């Protein structure tokens, strides 16, 4: 199916239901009672949000996975193996299947001829697009295979329990039938490959020694050689054909199972995001490789035994020696491969850390740049990379040994066998010697694939362990118990709940604001304290059992699972967070939840959503959820799709939701209205816009219970007021709403208020009841009134008109029309991923050579390779020379008779020949070791330099790059592409270079014996060139498509993990799983064809090499008596070696080029990424103590985020005096945050300039500028590491200074209670701190910097009013000497400012003192303030 432009009519392919009947037919899926019945076959002008993510990446969509199930059900009635057996028909003419591989007969299947039409298309076009590629066969679809694997895993769990369950056994059962078949085919390959040299070659060589010629007999021998080689080639191709399909099925199945599990997880804290991305990108690949190559290991022992028996027959007892060498090398190779795998396992852990840290850097790059912490993070990643490189180097040495050993084994085996054989006085003829060498050569195939097989199996073994640990992680259980009364929607009885320890290291510690410290002991009695201390494993087990009471009877685990889970849970350390919660929420009630920072508000709503573990009591819920998270989660899709969230488009409801959430003016600003791509995590939206979109999604979803976690914190006062009245009170009037907030003025209108403190509900009732109680709530509310009422009389009638006026001045609301929207370039924020075209340019190889050490290093490596292969070739030639010398015409006396001997043992120089032969072996081993070390160091230097340069360029890229590029795409460069360059490329390249030189030596040797052989090589060379031209384009283009389809697939995983709580709440797991399966199948389609294209080429190359061996055989026959039998033996042994080698080498050439596409992709970023200004500019550095005053001047400043976008700051001019405190207000999108962006030079000005203390900031380095500014951002950001590293990454401050900053932000006691104090762990995203605590730590961070200029971007939005007031006081005291710019949404935070700047549409419309602006009832600020103040003053 072709790409469809956004906004045009199309049929939604996902979730792929054709009717209500189809929908209910899908096993394991139940209809959401809230969702209306619908049919998805009519045209719609809207898009499913999950579809758009793919269209952003330029992907076509496969037909629905559910149609696969239907077709398979039809075929299942014909028998389990019906489809498999139908392949046995030699030729098939039917084309009922959509994928040609399913229509292939045996001949087409094993020679991969079904792929030829695609090869022709690619050759003609010169490139391959996604629409040219066949969708994945239904038999390979991830949905079909994952269901089967899941069933097998479930059976395993039920039989033996989670701890004893073996995922390896399950995987074996999944692949068993196909693997056994492939092993049978492999045995045929080995037998054919062995019988050719063993019998046919032996007779050919004996014929060369015979004096009489028999043309008919000799031609029959050549025909026999031809047939054995054809059988060997095609049966091997059939082995690969079976294995590749098995591998693709296994990869699709296990990755789908993994993602399905991720969607069910309570939280991902046991696994980092980096590890999960690696599991889904690299570990899936490992499973494929194990299925594809693992079975080839079975061929080794068979050939070794056959070879040993045959050699004994030919040579007698000494024949054991050669085979013994092979047999001893086999376990040695296994051991070395195991060592490689051991280092790979260690390396994977380092890679996980690096990818996780990279993900963190990319997610928060804006803040890293603002804090001027680029260097600190760069050093952190470099440190992890250095460790990874060290392990990679060790793994590389062992890997290099396994690659280089195979050709040497033949020589060692030959040297040992022949030396001992003749030393013991046995005869050795040319026929015997070269038959044995040829048999040894045929045995090397088994040895060559052994490192591949063992490496793939041992790496898959590591992957299986990682998958198993993921599959056994605890799942989230949405609460199934229903309250006793039908009018009650949520009921909690004496509930004590906990986060598991991996989720939080401090979540259970009391959160202390100064006021609380006094009441701490009074709040909780001794009885409760003792309950807190009773924290035993027994309770943890009880909790888990109790947790099962929340499930329906059909969801409760079996006794075996129960037992396994107890053990599993018993080992968890549960962190109590909520105590003795008693709560009943009636239907249709609006319940406000408030409390200080860290009091347990978010934990309470998480408990209702099933995210926590219930230790005591019970929870019951009746209804479906809509959830607005404290930090809004945005999909990488259009704004409309983010609101629809998979539901059908209803224009009336949609427009009504837009009005309720004040989104109309925003649509007018966006370039493509509501069809604008809003990027990953809402990259180009303000915090307020993201929050309102999240709220609009909840309103549109039309659920019965709404959980709103502080949804108005990032909004302007009048916008927040409008949304509270219009959206929450009016639209959700009949719904049950839990409304968490720090803005207490809204609680006046709630039906009920819950006040939380230290994990308990301490007060509960209506606003009036709590005020009469005169408890904590009343105290805080009174403080709010005292702190916020200004000295200005406000008339409520004036307020209404003022508010209206301010709305009118804004842009006219953009209406969402029903006509098709035209997709413009501007509307698409996220750029389609670039795809290389044509062959990989030579410049890419040159970049790699330069990175590896330059041309000289490359030359040294090539010389070492040539010496390596040359020493091997020399030893074989020396053997033939020795045989040709025979007895050296020496005369032997037997009794009284003398005669000329023909036996080599009688040669007087035998010792000399034998010594040189043995010496060649020693030289080979030494050269091999040197080459291994040099090559590994060279390739690792290349990959490390590429990594470092890429990382440097990414860190120095301007913000527009991160706004338009999904994190998954950049991460793909650092995970999948780096893995290719680190591990796969060196492995492939080493074998490729070695084999190319070996091929030239083979052809040279044969041509040396038969010059006429070169005549036959000519036509075959032309044929080979044509084949190479066609296949090279096919393989390269398919590899590029494989790379490109990987990015959206990774982006979807990242995005889904970040929004797990929202996906659970909306019960959208099934939709996200379908989307994932579509993206995975989109990736598997070119990936499967890429692997098949390799074999398509291999089969055809085999025919060329078979032609070469047949030509050699014919020349031996036709030139009978003209050449010595020793040289004939040399030629035929090399010809036999050439057959497998030739196709293997050309396949390696294509594969190595395909691997180089990863270097090309990395190099593309290195070459094309534009850089922001340098960190420091020589001779232009500002004075060390700059700025001393802190004066900020904007002169006609103009700024736009990207070319072709409208200006967001228009001719802005103003001067802020030193130490002045400025409040900046304005509607969302008015340009408030853009001022900060301009000041930090995150976006360079389009015109005008900014000066600080008279110095133009555009003239100095970015680090010089940013290190002198401090910011407390709207979105509090903590990085994984320690508390200390988050406050002071450069270790610039003393411990006392850090504790002082923590004390001033009221976090000292909280951090002091942690076991490791400042060295306590901070988890990814700071998830073990509440949002309010994170914000306090960000303020502490700013306090430490002692900067003259501070920007506060709504810094206290996530705090309760009391903490807010305390922090405001701290900020006023600490930054009294600083120039302060406060970007505010809650207007009371800026009333104490010296002046207030009002922005509208990127222009300064008002700039004066608060008293002047509030005394003018026609001012915008007056209107905005009136909207907020009326709420408190009138109703409070």
UniProtKB/Swiss-Prot annotation:
**Coiled coil region boundaries:** none
Q: What happens when the gene is disrupted?
A: Mrp5 knockout mice are viable with no overt phenotypes, deficient mice accumulate endogenous glutamate conjugates in several tissues, including the inhibitory neuropeptides N-acetylaspartylglutamate (NAAG) and N-acetylaspartyldiglutamate (NAAG2), but brain in particular. Abcc5-/- mice show lower white and brown adipose tissue and increased glucagon-like peptide 1 (GLP-1) release from enteroendocrine cells of the small intestine, and are more insulin sensitive.
Q: What is its EC number?
A: 7.6.2.-, 7.6.2.2
Compartment(s) of residence? Basolateral cell membrane; Golgi apparatus lumen; Endosome membrane; Cytoplasmic granule
Q: Where in the sequence does glycosylation occur per the annotation? A: 494, 636, 684, 889, 896, 1043, 1328, 1416
Which segment of the chain is annotated as a signal peptide?
none
Q: Which residues carry this modification: Phosphothreonine?
A: 513
**Transmembrane segments annotated in the record for this chain:** 179-199, 219-239, 296-316, 317-337, 400-420, 426-446, 608-628, 847-867, 916-936, 996-1016, 1017-1037, 1101-1121, 1126-1146
Its placement in the membrane is given as: Multi-pass membrane protein
Q: Where is the composition biased (Basic residues)?
A: 514-529
Disulfide bridge positions per record: none
Give the reaction(s) catalysed: ATP + H2O + xenobioticSide 1 = ADP + phosphate + xenobioticSide 2; 3',5'-cyclic GMP(in) + ATP + H2O = 3',5'-cyclic GMP(out) + ADP + phosphate + H(+); 3',5'-cyclic AMP(in) + ATP + H2O = 3',5'-cyclic AMP(out) + ADP + phosphate + H(+); N-acetyl-L-aspartyl-L-glutamate(in) + ATP + H2O = N-acetyl-L-aspartyl-L-glutamate(out) + ADP + phosphate + H(+)
Pfam families, alphabetized? ABC_membrane, ABC_tran
What ranges does the record list as Polar residues composition bias?
501-511
Q: In which domain of life is the source organism classified?
A: Eukaryota
Location of region: Disordered: 1-41, 501-569, 798-822
Q: Residues in domain ABC transmembrane type-1?
A: 179-459, 858-1154
Q: List other remarks.
A: Although other labs have confirmed the ability of ABCC5 to transport cGMP in an ATP-dependent manner, they obtained a much lower affinity for this substrate. The authors conclude that ABCC5 is a low-affinity cyclic nucleotide transporter and a major function in cGMP excretion is unlikely.
| Biological role | ATP-dependent transporter of the ATP-binding cassette (ABC) family that actively extrudes physiological compounds, and xenobiotics from cells. Mediates ATP-dependent transport of endogenous metabolites like cyclic nucleotides, such as cAMP and cGMP, folic acid and N-lactoyl-amino acids (in vitro). Acts also as a general glutamate conjugate and analog transporter that can limit the brain levels of endogenous metabolites, drugs, and toxins. Confers resistance to the antiviral agent PMEA.
Its protein name is ATP-binding cassette sub-family C member 5
Give the species this sequence originates from: Mus musculus (Mouse)
Gene coding for it: Abcc5
